């Protein structure tokens, strides 16, 4: 478990409502436990995605972290460029686009930030698997995307 203060802690200590939505047992679900945030853990990414949409519609939270784990899992098992891994990445992009549109609709009267923040890269180990954690560009150089949107 990660014990240093994080963005989640800063928001919670400032009186903001924070939710972490993820697959049960994945890294994000486990390393940020024991914080003053609400946790929603599910068996699949699809269930996490549906809960994230529900939480956005309820408009209770100031910060929602929705973590998609399938690409990471499948790229370890099959390699980052395997068709099944690429399909999972396409699903992640589709989920992000849908959540972005929903956030813009639900939170249109609020200033907001939408962010796509991968936690690491990945490289091919052999023809059947991938991994991360080395000091190589494939593992260390990741693109983060964000958009600031003013209240309407």
Predicted regions and their residues:
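Feature captures the catalytic ectodomains and active-site-proximal regions of enzymes
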Residues: 1-152
């Amino acid at each position: 478990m990660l014990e240093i203060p994080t963005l989640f802690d800063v928001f919670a200590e400032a009186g903001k409502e924070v939710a972490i939505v993820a697959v049960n047992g994945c890294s994000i679900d486990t390393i940020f436990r024991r914080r003053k945030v609400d946790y929603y853990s599910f068996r699949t990414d699809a269930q996490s995605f549906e809960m994230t949409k529900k939480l956005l519609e309820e408009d209770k939270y100031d910060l929602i972290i929705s973590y998609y784990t399938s690409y990471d899992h499948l790229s370890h098992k099959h390699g980052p460029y395997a068709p099944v891994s690429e399909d999972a990445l396409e699903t992640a992009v589709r989920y992000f686009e849908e959540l972005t549109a929903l956030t813009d609709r639900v939170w249109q009267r609020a200033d907001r930030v939408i962010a796509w923040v991968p936690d690491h890269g990945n490289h091919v180990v052999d023809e059947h698997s991938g991994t991360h954690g080395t000091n190589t560009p494939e593992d260390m150089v990741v693109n983060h995307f964000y958009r600031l949107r003013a209240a309407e």
